[in-house]
Regions:
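Bacterial Sec-dependent N-terminal signal peptides
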Residues: 1-11
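Alpha-helical transmembrane segments
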Residues: 14-18
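C-terminal motif of bacterial Sec signal peptides marking the signal peptidase cleavage site
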Residues: 19-23
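Bacterial signal peptide processing site
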Residues: 25-28
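Short, well-ordered surface patches within globular domains
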Residues: 33-107, 162
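A well-ordered secondary-structure block
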Residues: 100-181
Length: 181
């Protein structure tokens, strides 16, 4: 059990939407105010590398090795447009049906992972751009690792890889992480 607690520390959790995250493979989005599907975002590869590196370093400091996976990052990117919209709805910067949009995001990520014969747990959050630091990531890990660990355990996922999709919009850094087998 101690190993699992250490493993949980390697997972970034959702500072804004953690309580609504579930294992990938969710039930699809609704039609009213649902996921956009066509919204596009520009991924920030430099920030993605920083985000993944921070998670890998943190995990290594807790005895866990997570391999960076471009395939898992691409799965995270599949849900990124809807995650941005959902978090904007949550913080009052957009209108719409948060649950439907978030459901659309998790379905897109789950489908992408499934097509690669992978399973994973997503975690998403947004920081003000000035707050996107390694220290902030560590504080997030410390605050939410227990919840993420529960999701990994319940989904029977042995974390081996990490991927992320990151974009910057209106002074916020939006991050979707996926920890996968």
């Amino acid at each position: 059990m101690k190993m699992w607690k250490k493993l949980a520390a390697c997972v970034l959790a959702a500072a804004m939407a953690l309580t609504l995250l579930t294992a990938c493979g969710g039930g699809g989005g609704g039609s009213t105010g649902g996921g956009s599907g066509s919204n596009s975002v520009v991924r920030d590869k430099t920030k993605e590398d920083q985000a993944i590196s921070s998670v890998q370093e943190y995990a290594a400091n807790h005895g866990v090795t997570l391999e960076k996976s471009d395939a898992v990052s691409n799965a995270a990117a599949a849900g990124l447009p809807d995650v941005v919209r959902a978090l904007d709805i949550q913080r009052g910067a957009a209108s719409g049906d948060y649950m439907a949009v978030f459901s659309s995001a998790t379905t897109a990520m789950g489908n992408s992972l499934y097509s690669q014969k992978k399973a994973g747990v997503p975690a998403c959050f947004a920081y003000k751009e000035a707050d996107f630091t390694k220290d902030t990531i560590v504080r997030t890990l410390n605050a939410y690792s227990g919840s993420i660990m529960d999701q990994l355990t319940n989904a029977k996922i042995s974390p081996e890889t990490v991927g992320a999709a990151v974009t910057v919009k209106d002074g916020y850094v939006y991050i979707v992480y996926i920890i996968a087998n």
